[in-house]
């Protein structure tokens, strides 16, 4: 019984480490926020992430953004709207590759007030 426990403990610890994936720490604007204007779109991660694709949409239609972060792994992704955002509800969706090689995706929404 003790031998089984001793052998199982390292496996349990490895499984926990393998299950830990990069997570979003914060976004700008904050998820669900209502703001007057948006000068910068930012996603902060708890570990380096290579953001492969990012798309901003309003009512399902894509809105142009200019990436300020390259394709290298970063702890914070930055982009700016190509034009001033009109009032409405927006969503920024992204796809990326975590440092451990796992594909990741996420997104957040915000509203620009009139």
Identify the residue ranges that each predicted region occupies.
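N-terminal edge beta-strand
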Residues: 19-36
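Bacterial N-terminal signal peptides that target proteins for export
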Residues: 1-9
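N-terminal signal peptide c-region/cleavage motif recognized by signal peptidases
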Residues: 15-17
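Exposed loop/turn and edge beta-strand positions of beta-sandwich/beta-sheet ligand-binding modules
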Residues: 23, 39, 75
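Acidic, low-complexity Ser/Thr/Gly/Pro-rich repeat segments typical of extracellular/periplasmic
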Residues: 42-114
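Solvent-exposed, flexible loop/coil residues
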Residues: 28, 39, 108
């Amino acid at each position: 019984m003790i031998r089984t426990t001793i052998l199982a403990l390292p496996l349990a610890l490895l499984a926990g480490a393998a299950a830990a994936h990069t997570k979003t720490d914060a976004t700008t604007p904050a998820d669900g926020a209502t703001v007057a204007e948006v000068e910068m779109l930012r996603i902060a991660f708890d570990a380096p992430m290579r953001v492969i694709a990012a798309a901003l949409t309003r009512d399902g239609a894509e809105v142009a953004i200019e990436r300020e972060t390259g394709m290298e792994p970063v702890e914070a992704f930055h982009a700016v709207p190509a034009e001033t955002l009109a009032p409405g509800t927006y969503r920024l969706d992204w796809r990326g590759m975590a440092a451990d090689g796992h594909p990741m995706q996420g997104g957040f929404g915000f509203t620009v007030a009139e």
